[in-house]
Amino acid sequence: MEPEELTIEWYEENGLEKPIHFRCDPTRIGMKLPSPSTFTVDSVLELVGGNRMIEVVQVEDQGSVKMTLEEFVEFYKTPRDQRKNLYNVLSLEYSLTPLEDLVNSPALVRQIDWVGNIWPDALRQRWISFNGREKKSYFPHHTFPKVQNYCLMSVANCYTDFHIDFSGTSVWYHVLKGRKVFWLIPPTATNFFIYQEFIKTVSDNAFFGRSVEACHVAVLEPGDTMLIPSGWIHAVYTPDDSLVFGGNFLHSLSCQTQLRVYQVENKLNITRKFRLPYNEELLFYVMADYVKKWTGREYVRPLLVEDAKLDYVGEKWKAAGGHLKKIRFEDYNVEVTSEMVKNEEESEKDEVKVIAMHAGSSNYDNAMISKMSYTEATGLEEEAEDEDVKPETKKEAEERRDAEIDLLAATNSLIFYRNSKHDFIRNKSVPDHKLPIGHEPPVYFNDEEVSRISPRLLEELEALGAYIRRKNRVEVAEGICHPASLINLFNTVLKKRRAELTGKPFQFNQIMPRRYTRAAIETGDYDFEPVRTIEDSRRASQFKVEDFPDELLESDEPDETSRIHLPHQPSSGPLEYIPTPRGEIRENSLGFEPEYDEDMEEYDPAEQVVKEELEEEEEEEEGEEEEEEEYVAPVTRRSSTRGSASTKEEPQEEKEEKEAAPKKEKKEKKVKKEKSSKPEKDTTEAKLKKEKKKKEMERRLRDSELEAELRAAHGGKNAKSKKKPEKPAYVGGLPTAPIQNDPVVSNPYNYDPRMEMMKLGTGQLKSAYRKTKANVELHIEKNLYKLEPKRDESESREPSMEHEDSPTTPHAPYDRYSHYHTENSHFQEDQDSHRTPAKRSKYDNISVDTSESPHIPKKRSLEGRPSPYSVISPPHNRPKLSSPAMFSPSSEPRRSNDRRTSDPAVNAMKKGVYMPPMSRQDKMIAEAASASSSRHSSFSERRPSFIPDLNSSRHSSTDTPMYTPTAPARSSWLPNTSNVTRHSLDDDSPIDVVSESPIDVLNSPPFPRSITPPPVSLSELKSQSNGRKSNYSEDGKRAKIPAREAVAELKTLIGKLKTLNEA
């Protein structure tokens, strides 16, 4: 492009998206530069000052070294072959020095630069730190983004690796001497991601240009100028010794890229030293500047030079020639405290530092001097001071300026700033930009300025507004007191412009003005008068008082009867609560306003107290009469204050009317006595009366109905007040159901809410949110029960009783299948098998039928063992047992009330506690698995009826006659269960179902039934093993089998049990 085309119009239309290389006279693009033939590094040393400390890049490791400018110039002048190290100066900012008058950036850059055009001039301040014992060298620190002008001095073979300029700033670059080679990479999303990974790998020495999508090369010769857009990744190589001028700037048409780079810096945790200072404060100033153009509102307080806390170096200072003066330690005699610069960068630990600023008597610090006097070196004439002017103290000047700002903000609705006391803390992030906005005056848009927002600019500014709104904490700039209102209005204008470009209607939600109370309007405690709306004008009367004659107007005298005056409320919006004074509220003892007729005389609180006492006496007398009534209903508040209707017949009503007549006479007499005994009211007596009334009210509040209910709930009694009898309440002519004290449904968990309450002042109620052992676990007896027949008394005794009998009467262990039962005992055992099981320990092993006698292995005779399908003999033909140990009167089960009452399960059932039983399948698996471990228990115990006794063959004797178990006769109401095909020959399940009688079903508790399995012989198990090796030896002992076979056998048993349960 031609140099003359680089204008503001071209910029607004195209923006800065690609690098622009100009090889022309720099004056054609609005630049100002010294002559290359006469300007050298010695000129820089003379104009800037040799005692200025600079940070130099060490090319070998891309580190940094500090040295004075004079030391670097000496290194620069050394011959090329004598340089041991390569140093590169990239951070010599020459603003506020005489060199600034010789070099100017391109005209377009100066027009669009945010820092040069928007940053407040009064906030351009600095402070200087002097180093060394002699205080010759110094380092300047600035309180604004000072990045506009740089002088870059590089020796040959210097290289700067790939980087993005801080905060996404754009760069202008002019080569005065030497050459520069640039590698440029566009800021695409892919390249940004690769660059972040490149920054993280510090030890990577590979050339980054080969890892990206595209990389461009540009060679700048002496006299060339280039503009590098925001976000472009670039590296620079210096083939010859060079002297370059450049600078960084931020502008509006690169907001998205600038914010993206700023976020990448936050993500990579780049130190403050290598970032743009005061970036977020600058964003607030930019938004405030746009809002002022679009709406006329001013959000930035005009800052004064006199308010500068540090050394002012703004435009007025430069116009006075302050930048021409050399910096020397002798000119600074005021030290700056560490609190003033605690957030600034600190120098090295080993250097000697003295922080100083201009003296108080300096030419740039006195606010009362309109024209400053200068030395002879400046060439300006001195002006005599006015003798009549009296100096004003600093405190008086601050108070005067604050009063002026407050007056301006109160009178002008476009002023949205306050005095300096409302400023935010400097360099501290706050979330105040997300506070609610509140009331605001109407917004007036400048349509001419709003229409200048191009689609390109609108997209960039929308990204800026969205970023500030989403950020949790921001650094609010000095002078801005309403950041939330500023952000809201900035985004509102952008929405309006977006609606205009898209052709959609714009709906602006104007924030309603605050509804002021009458007190605020009378005292003037408001910012501006509320605008009168149409609704208010509708409510206003169309006629005036002067239009009516006096005869038609009401008298101004106040009415005798007190009226309730409602406050004036708007027709829309929330109603305001105007509290009524405490003295105007009349309450009775219960805290409610008493009801009285409109035609009654003036309200007297003493008379009301007497009436209440009389009503209480009446109610007590009525309660004594009504104690004989049968029906008593709970008391309601309405029924207690008003007289309840009597439910008696007409003769009783007539009696009540007769009794009521003398009561009225008593009331009138008491009231007359009280009135006659009243003395004349004096001031002291009135005060005493008020105090007495307050004490009486407090006493009655303490003894109120609420406190009585609380005491009753806590178990206490109200000793002061007499309990009144409960009266029936009627709703719609029918009596309500009385409230039951006891719960209708039984409490299954034994939870008593009254036990959770405690008296006030004695402790703290249990928290519903704090999980503790007390409020999580229920107090229930955690006992596991097994369903098994009831044991007799001999079996429930201690094991020592059995040990005494075992040596005298050696016998085989108890075999349930060989036991002889009479008809009654069989029925009785069947009944007991359905009773509540006895309490069993949680970890008790399942015992088997063993005894302490020595085990004599014998073969069981299988001749007398019936098959499952053999004919069952009747019960009266059963043979008697020959062994006395197998059957004894003490071992016969019998029904006893003591056992039923002492059974913990029965007690638990009476209490209403549900004890969940184990499933039948789980019990069978558990007992089958633990049968081998409990074979040699210390005492004999009956096996549960649903577990087959597979090992009983090794204890049975051949001499013991076998019995044939019988099933009860099938009743007519039961299905046919005696079918011989119920268990086929292939089914090896040892479990059968014993049918029940109707009486057993009706009387049995809701517990699982015990099932008596049919007898199973060892031969049957061997025949049903499908050719598999038997697990039992000839002597009846269980042989050891592999674990896999045991698991497989257990699985088959479980499967068969499941099929039986499903059937």
Curated annotation (Swiss-Prot):
UniProt-annotated binding residues for substrate: 160, 180
Annotated stretches, region: Disordered: 379-400, 554-750, 776-1040
Reactions this protein catalyses: N(6),N(6)-dimethyl-L-lysyl(36)-[histone H3] + 2 2-oxoglutarate + 2 O2 = L-lysyl(36)-[histone H3] + 2 formaldehyde + 2 succinate + 2 CO2
Stretches assigned to the JmjC domain: 86-266
Superkingdom assignment: Eukaryota
Reported cofactor(s): Fe(2+)
Compositional bias (Basic and acidic residues): 390-400, 647-665, 674-712, 776-806, 813-835, 892-902, 1031-1040
Biased composition (Pro residues): 1005-1016
GO cellular component assignments: nucleus
An example Gene Ontology molecular-function term: histone H3K36me/H3K36me2 demethylase activity
Coiled coil: none
Biased composition (Polar residues): 950-963, 973-982, 1020-1030
EC number of this enzyme: 1.14.11.27
GO terms, biological process: chromatin remodeling; regulation of transcription by RNA polymerase II
Compositionally biased intervals (Acidic residues): 379-389, 594-605, 613-631
Cofactor binding, per record: Binds 1 Fe(2+) ion per subunit.
Residue ranges with Low complexity bias: 636-646, 926-937
Keyword set, alphabetical order: Chromatin regulator, Dioxygenase, Iron, Metal-binding, Nucleus, Oxidoreductase, Transcription, Transcription regulation
Binding residue positions for Fe cation: 163, 165, 234
Subcellular localization, as worded in the UniProt entry: Nucleus
Family the UniProt entry places it in: Belongs to the JHDM1 histone demethylase family.
Domain notes: The JmjC domain mediates the demethylation activity.
Role played: Histone demethylase that specifically demethylates 'Lys-36' of histone H3, thereby playing a central role in histone code.
Protein name: JmjC domain-containing histone demethylation protein 1
Protein species of origin: Caenorhabditis briggsae
